[in-house]
Amino acid sequence: MKQLWLIPALPLAGFLLNGLVALVASSMRAEKESGADHPGVPLPYAQRLFHGVVGVGSVGLAAVLSFAALVPYALGSMQVPEGLAPIVQKVYTWMAAGDYTVDVAFRLDALSALMLSFVTLVGTLIHVYSVGYMQKEEGYGRYFSYLNLFMFAMLTLVLADSLPLLFVGWEGVGLCSYLLIGYYYDKDFAVAAGKKAFIANRVGDFGMVLGIFGVFALFGTADFSFVELAKRQVLAGNAPLGVYAVCLLLFLGACGKSAQGPLYVWLPDAMAGPTPVSALIHAATMVTAGVYLIARCSALFVLAPDALTLVAWIGAGTAIFAATIGLAQNDIKKVLAYSTVSQLGYMFLACGVGAFGAGMFHVFTHSFFKACLFLGSGSVIHAMHHEQDMRKMGGLAGRIPQTFRTMLVATLAIAGIVPLAGFFSKDMILGSAAASGHWVLYLVGLFTAGLTAFYMFRLVSMTFFGAPRGDDHGHGEHAHESPATMTVPLWILAAFSVVAGAVGIPAVLGGTDAVGRFLEPSVTHPPIGEMAHGLEIGLMLLSLGVAVTGLAWAWRWYGRAAGPVEAVSPQAHAFYEKTGALGRLVANRWNVDEGIEALVLSPFRKIGTFLWRGFDALFIDGIANASAFLVEILGDLLRFFTTGHVRNYALAFTLGFAALVAYVWMS
């Protein structure tokens, strides 16, 4: 592949074409007093077809070019023990300062090749799904133009050969998330969610910018050649002064984009956008960027072991924290949102214990089953006439069988059931934590795996099993399967949820750990111990047993759930009654939003009000108003002497001249 720049350029062209056509068509209809986005006025079929073909086609062609580039590279890398050298293609010089230049250059290596494989594939399937899902929505052209721009930004981020260019893609996905989360701009909650995502990410992006400057200060360059310099220092056992601070700043940026620690709060609210957007953000694009950044800068983090430890603990804490919230959510998309936060915590846990390859492997497998789950939830919502409360669902397995089967496969995959993809990637993370001696982190991850299995099968049980629990409109009774444009992507994603783990089967199970060997040249690992085969198999069986226990527990409580909306499961109701305040706290998402409001937003709002009223209005405005008042008084005094009569001016001139002569004579 000699033109890597074409891969991000194609979605960019799709954005420009779709946006231009949508804008021109909207203006033409506005002249006819109909309006392209007016409720109830559908776009002409030809225009919808154009937007769909351009939107899907541009990303689909990018996927074809991606696989044309990465398949030969991957095959070549597997034949060379040390892997192929990265392919770097310079497009043009972006900035120059003395001898230093920042180029628009694209890099293909094992890490970017792995990212390209699922970003373009999953992105294409989400675009295809959107053709059916968004068919009757307003702003069809605007939607596909934003979606194409999102893909352009993400592909730029993945292929960038320098931190400055990566940051362009980084900010691009942030902008697109704001546009797409707030897609329904006539709804206040969607607008608020878009703002929340944008502002929360600015906190992380501030750290990211400082981290980029820190990298330049340490290594004299922000190109990814600094990774090789860092690798040499790892081998030499030298860590430059300030590397810990730089790692923390880059990690802050990763936390914002990948919703870790307190910066997770924007991600659940991102459900305000269309469901395919949720799938794109949560599965293949934006939220994986933080993990990718940590893996790309792995050599830098290895130089700061304390920073890695912090990454691991933040990831583990976020994983179990978000999993507990997922236990008590009733909105089908909110359950999946907190599941994403939890699974991202798993990925950061892996990176924190030095298993960067395991973290990226889980990014890879997670993209398929999480996209399948989100798109499946969209199919459920479509069938239930936009109902998202699982307490009003039930009995849908027979009415939307394709959606049910694909979501069941994806649920078993995320739960870590053998031989599905999630089993291998999750166990690679847990095994790495154990092998590196982080047994507390291992136990946290193991317990989180059980919670994941429980709340995900709770979702399946409440949605598909039991008797319909719909409202008076009887949506459950009249549910219908989605069109082929929506179900075919579900089946493809479900298939990858089964087979994607094959590239990471460990040697103890007869595999070759192909993904680990493939990524080896692109990431730097600290020393991780080896486990005895018996212990490794024992830990796998233990995690499998925990997952099965979680599934069984969810089935026992929710599998046959029926009855009124207020009491979907008597056992669950009794459990939450027994847990009392703790249960209510979990159901209310640990009151994190309220805590942030009380501890951060409200104090800053009060400080802002004080500065506005006490400083700006009183002091700054006071100075300006006092100046105006003095000028006004001076004007009034001068006006007293300004009569408009020449004789008065002549008298004043004569008296003044006489006074001047007297002063000179007396002196």
Residue map of PLM features:
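Hydrophobic alpha-helical transmembrane segments of polytopic
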Residues: 4-14, 51-65, 112-119, 147-150, ...
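Membrane-interfacial, low-structure loops and terminal tails that flank and connect transmembrane helices
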Residues: 29-47, 392, 472-478, 629, ...
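Aromatic-capped, Gly/Pro-kinked transmembrane alpha-helices
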Residues: 88-91, 97-110, 506-542, 556-667
